[in-house]
């Protein structure tokens, strides 16, 4: 009886392993998403990426709550790759020589997507006058400056040194209020957490009780955009770390004033919050593990 149980356990483990293993598709050789047929390409839960993954024929991968979870799944062989914006790939791949990404272009070799689906905007509470005020500030930032800032943030997150940021402004001497911004602080190069040693432009992270988290600093493209907006509006910036699924509820409840977290203004989200103009647009790519 014990021997039979042992055999059953072994068979079950093998079957589970097979179910959770990657496919036989060589992602590295793909030239378009059509070449990814049958591959297991994951995406983050609650994002447009989760819809885009359905464009890959025969894709059986699951969605994951965080990018770190997808990276773990990729490393373990549970998936063949995962969808990300190109800036994320620029931040992740140079720091790990086992990873690379497919340089796909939206609506040609890559995923079918509108600018609204692949662009990111700042979310605020429904009816807030912050939309117009923030849009006026964003209009001052040229496309070249936005691109150069993103490259810098990718470099910083990859451990490279940057001496001066492409986008900066003087903080107000006498702020007229506080701009509370929520983000994950875990989505390089858009936003991440520095521990103990803040990189250039990093700011303290606050907990949900309004207290500074000791030794934790937020940095990234989103942080620099938020800092620039706050400075131009004459406000003090405070960054709050939230799980992705808690970001929209935080704005709706009034716990924070806005979300700057690499968030796309999907129709579903537009029913819950108001969005500003885009502050960055990008191609969707697929990060994979080299064979």
Describe these PLM feature segments.
Residues 2-10:
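Sec-dependent signal peptide recognition
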Residues 25-33, 150-177:
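Bacterial Sec-exported substrate-binding components of ABC uptake systems
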Residues 14-18:
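C-terminal motif of bacterial Sec signal peptides marking the signal peptidase cleavage site
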Residues 20, 45-47, 112-161, 225-232, ...:
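Extended ligand-binding regions for polar small-molecule ligands
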Residues 40-43, 55-56, 60-67, 72-76, ...:
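Extracytoplasmic small-molecule ligand-binding "clamshell" domains
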Residues 22-36, 87-117, 231, 236-291:
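Acidic, polar ligand-binding/catalytic clefts
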Residues 51-56, 93-95:
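Short loop/helix-cap segments at secondary-structure boundaries that form the rim of catalytic
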């Amino acid at each position: 009886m014990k021997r039979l149980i042992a055999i059953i356990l072994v068979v079950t483990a093998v079957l589970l392993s097979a179910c959770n293993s990657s496919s036989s598709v060589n992602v590295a050789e793909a030239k378009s998403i059509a070449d990814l047929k049958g591959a297991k390409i994951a995406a983050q839960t609650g994002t447009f990426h989760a819809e885009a993954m359905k464009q890959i024929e025969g894709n059986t991968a699951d969605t994951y709550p965080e990018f770190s979870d997808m990276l773990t799944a990729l490393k373990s062989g549970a998936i063949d790759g995962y969808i990300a914006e190109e800036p994320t790939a620029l931040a992740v791949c140079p720091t790990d020589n086992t990873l690379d990404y497919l340089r796909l272009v939206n609506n040609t070799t890559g995923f079918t997507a509108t600018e609204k689906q692949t662009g990111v905007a700042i979310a605020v509470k429904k009816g807030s006058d912050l939309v117009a005020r923030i849009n006026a500030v964003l209009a001052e930032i040229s496309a070249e400056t936005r691109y150069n800032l993103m490259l810098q943030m990718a470099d910083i997150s990859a451990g490279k040194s940057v001496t001066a940021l492409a986008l900066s402004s003087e903080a107000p001497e006498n702020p007229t209020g506080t701009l509370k911004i929520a983000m994950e602080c875990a989505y390089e190069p858009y936003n991440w957490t520095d521990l103990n040693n803040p990189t250039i432009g990093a700011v303290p992270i606050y907990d949900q009780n309004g207290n500074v988290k000791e030794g934790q600093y937020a940095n990234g493209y989103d942080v620099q955009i938020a800092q620039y907006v706050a400075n131009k509006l004459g406000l003090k910036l405070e960054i709050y770390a939230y799980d992705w699924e808690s970001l929209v509820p935080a704005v709706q409840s009034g716990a924070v004033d806005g979300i700057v977290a690499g968030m796309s203004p999907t129709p579903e989200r537009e029913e819950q919050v108001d969005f500003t103009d885009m502050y960055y647009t990008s191609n969707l790519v697929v990060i994979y593990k080299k064979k």
